[in-house]
């Protein structure tokens, strides 16, 4: 059990999970403290992004993940992996994880923190090494779905174009992008003509949204 230090009685990850148990909206939980890994197990649910600095509550040493994550999420250009002039939560996680790994490597020390991200609700979490760019290439198990899709669409400091999207346009765009990702992952099981026809349809719908924003 991991505890969160606050003024007054500390509370546990299990207690926080209980308080948020009936919350039905989108939720992002970022715990950059040591021993934070259990928050993946306790807090992960569909529609949530959970990021922790450690892989379990046994990693109790001082963590450096939070410093690098804070730098990235504010819009650090080096963290913008897809070059869209903004930095998503996924990109921030990947950047911070890689910087942590470099810190320990350059200091010739054994790494005592291994960050995790979970945004598919399976409570398993994924490591930064399991991504190539922003594309997941590995999952915790053969049956598990990849993490990262939801976190890739969440941005704290938006670019100029993103600011012009209405909430409804953002919702439509995000859903279409998720459909494109799902389609690409199923490419091997589809007829080639069928695959490209479906992809073209989705991309045209995305283009209509972008055109509408450009004309506004």
Which ranges hold each PLM region?
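Extracytoplasmic/secreted envelope proteins and their assembly/folding machinery
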Residues: 13-20, 36, 48, 62-70, ...
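A short linear-motif detector with a strong N-terminal bias
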Residues: 8-9, 28-32, 161-162
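Structured segments of extracytoplasmic/periplasmic soluble domains
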Residues: 19-26, 42, 71-79, 95-106, ...
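Second-shell loop/turn segments in exported
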Residues: 2-7, 53-59, 79-83, 162-170, ...
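Disordered regulatory segments flanking catalytic cores
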Residues: 109-216
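Active-site-proximal C-terminal subdomain of hydrolase catalytic domains
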Residues: 27-127
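A short, glycine/acidic-enriched catalytic loop
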Residues: 1-22
């Amino acid at each position: 059990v991991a505890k969160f230090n606050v003024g007054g009685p500390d509370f546990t990850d299990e207690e926080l999970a209980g308080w948020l148990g009936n919350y039905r909206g989108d939720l992002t939980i970022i715990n950059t403290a040591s021993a934070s890994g259990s928050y993946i197990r306790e807090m992960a649910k569909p529609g949530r992004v959970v990021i922790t600095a450690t892989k379990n509550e046994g990693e109790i040493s001082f963590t450096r993940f939070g410093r690098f994550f804070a730098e990235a999420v504010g819009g650090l250009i080096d963290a913008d992996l897809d070059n869209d002039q903004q930095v998503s939560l996924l990109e921030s996680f990947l950047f911070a994880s890689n910087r942590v790994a470099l810190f320990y490597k350059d200091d010739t020390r054994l790494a005592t923190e291994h960050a995790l991200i979970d945004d598919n609700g399976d409570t398993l979490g994924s490591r930064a090494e399991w991504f190539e760019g922003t594309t997941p290439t590995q999952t915790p198990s053969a049956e598990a779905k990849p993490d990262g899709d939801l976190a890739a669409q969440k941005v704290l400091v938006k670019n100029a174009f993103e600011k012009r999207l209405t909430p409804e346009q953002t919702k439509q765009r995000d859903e279409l992008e998720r459909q494109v990702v799902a389609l690409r992952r199923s490419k091997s099981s589809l007829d080639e003509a069928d695959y490209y026809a479906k992809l073209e349809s989705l991309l045209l719908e995305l283009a209509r949204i972008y055109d509408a924003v450009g004309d506004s």
